[in-house]
């Protein structure tokens, strides 16, 4: 049986990309019975007699799954944050990074609008960028208005399934349109036909850019730590995770415990104070979260 990847799901049809092209498929009735919903990004087994009539027979296990947009098996997230208008926001960036690390997705930090900064702001942003690079993150500088700077991003997309995410007003859609200019019409098309408040569901589609696939809908529209527990949080901060193995107590929360290697690393300047401050804020937020029943 042939295998492929679902690149679009719309009105009960699943569009499966495989070696010979794309086949329009329906899901088997057993999926509904077992409450399995195939998602864009799923690797599947399918059967088809012709390109427009096929059936998805099996959905392979997922390595991760996002709710908004509904997509599975994401390799990386391109996190778009502006240097100015709005100003660079490390607190919000850390929130995105926690969510992405929790879903086992590789983050790539892309700081846009670098063509608009003055010298003082450039120094500030570059200082933050160096901090994040030392933590092990890829950090890129781009200007949405120049295709040359967007070309910096393209090699990172090769062979991967990527989502674009980030704060509002930083040009996520503009970036997608520069990567694939023909998307602009499609974006306008969707927004004119699908109005908010109506009973319509915006579909997500994976679009080919080089040998990579990029979701055409920005990811992580919800920034709440709904599923993350305090004990998970350390593992979403790479530098805290590295230091925590030297804490005296297993399960150390790095707040008030004695002989905490994380707090020692903060005092020694090995972990930045603003990252530790954000960690503590997120712990408090998780602890204040109302329990779900």
Swiss-Prot record:
Catalytic EC class: hydrolase
A Gene Ontology BP annotation from the UniProt entry: ribosomal small subunit biogenesis
Disulphide connectivity of cysteines: none
Alphabetical list of InterPro entries matching this protein: G_CP_dom, NA-bd_OB-fold, P-loop_NTPase, Ribosome_biogen_GTPase_RsgA, RsgA_GTPase_dom, RsgA_N
Residue positions binding GTP: 112-115, 166-174
Compartments it resides in: Cytoplasm
Coiled coil: none
Keywords assigned: Cytoplasm, GTP-binding, Hydrolase, Metal-binding, Nucleotide-binding, Ribosome biogenesis, RNA-binding, rRNA-binding, Zinc
Name recorded for this polypeptide: Small ribosomal subunit biogenesis GTPase RsgA
Lineage, highest ranks first: Bacteria, Bacillati, Bacillota, Bacilli, Bacillales
Gene name of the record: rsgA
């Amino acid at each position: 049986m042939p295998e492929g990847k679902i690149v679009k799901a719309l009105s009960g049809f699943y569009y499966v990309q495989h070696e010979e092209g794309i086949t329009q498929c329906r899901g088997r009735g057993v999926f509904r019975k077992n409450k399995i919903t195939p998602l864009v990004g799923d690797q599947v087994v399918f059967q088809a007699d012709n390109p427009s009539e096929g059936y998805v027979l099996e959905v392979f296990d997922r390595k991760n799954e996002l709710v908004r947009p509904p997509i599975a098996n994401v390799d990386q997230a391109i996190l778009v944050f502006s240097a100015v208008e709005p100003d660079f926001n490390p607190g919000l960036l850390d929130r995105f990074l926690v969510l992405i690390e929790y879903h086992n997705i590789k983050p790539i930090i892309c700081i846009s609008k670098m063509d608009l900064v003055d010298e003082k702001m450039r120094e500030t942003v570059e200082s933050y960028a160096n901090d994040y690079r030392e933590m092990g993150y890829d950090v890129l500088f781009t200007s949405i208005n120049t295709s040359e700077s967007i070309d910096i991003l393209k090699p990172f997309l090769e062979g991967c399934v990527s989502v674009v995410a980030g704060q509002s007003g930083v040009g996520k859609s503009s970036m997608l349109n520069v990567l694939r200019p023909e998307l602009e019409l499609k974006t306008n098309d969707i927004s004119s036909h699908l109005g908010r408040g109506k009973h319509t569901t915006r579909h997500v589609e994976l679009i080919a850019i080089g040998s990579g696939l990029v979701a055409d809908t920005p990811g992580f529209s919800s920034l709440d730590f709904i599923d993350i527990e305090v004990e998970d949080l350390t593992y979403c901060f790479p530098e805290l995770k590295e230091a925590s193995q030297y804490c005296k107590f297993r399960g150390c929360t790095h707040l008030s415990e004695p002989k905490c290697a994380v707090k020692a690393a903060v005092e020694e300047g090995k972990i930045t104070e603003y990252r530790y401050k954000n960690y503590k804020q997120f712990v408090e937020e998780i602890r204040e979260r109302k329990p779900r029943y």
